[in-house]
From Swiss-Prot:
UniProt keyword terms in alphabetical order: Amphibian defense peptide, G-protein coupled receptor impairing toxin, Secreted, Toxin, Vasoactive, Vasodilator
Cell location: Secreted
UniProt keyword Plastid present: no
Annotated source species: Ascaphus truei
Protein name: Bradykinin-like peptide AV-12
Tissues of expression: Expressed by the skin glands.
Length: 12
């Protein structure tokens, strides 16, 4: 799962 705060993986 994408980690919030880390680009380019951003949770909107």
């Amino acid at each position: 799962a994408p980690v919030p705060g880390l680009s380019p993986f951003r949770v909107v």
